[in-house]
Amino acid sequence: MERAEILGVGTELLYGETLDTNTAEIARSLKPYALKVERTLRVADEVAPLAREVEEAFARARLVVLSGGLGPTPDDVTREAVALALGEPLELDEAVLGEIEAFFRARGRAMPEANRKQAMRIPSATWLKNPRGTAPGWWVRKGGKDLVLLPGPPPEWRPMW
């Protein structure tokens, strides 16, 4: 049976300010598949420690799922950490930036500059469209392994998963 690991990203998870229900729900969703969830972990919103955990998890497991840290705030560093762990640069995707701008326009608002970072991805990532928010996810396949990045809010990641 192949291994899976799930990382809940967010300092608020470590301090109990937010209850990490995502990890358990994602783990339960993997039960019907030939994947054994071997490890779950909560990691702070810090690039270097998160990159290290991603690199180690990706070395051990066939599937690594990260939940959280894809928002527009300075502490949302999952993209940067995964780019560092996989040794790939972050690049702006103009089409996705346009979708995020359209999300705000549809609500009668201009997109804040901070949301621009949500349109950044590494070259090996495929976008997972977020029908309910501005944080798209990623699906990365490398060396026969998969890495999935999902936003933290359950109403956003569930339709993507």
Report each predicted region and the residues it spans:
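Glycine-rich beta-strand-to-loop/alpha-helix junction loops that act as flexible
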Residues: 9-11, 66-74, 151-152
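An anion/phosphate-binding loop that grips the pyrophosphate of nucleotide cofactors and donors
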Residues: 61
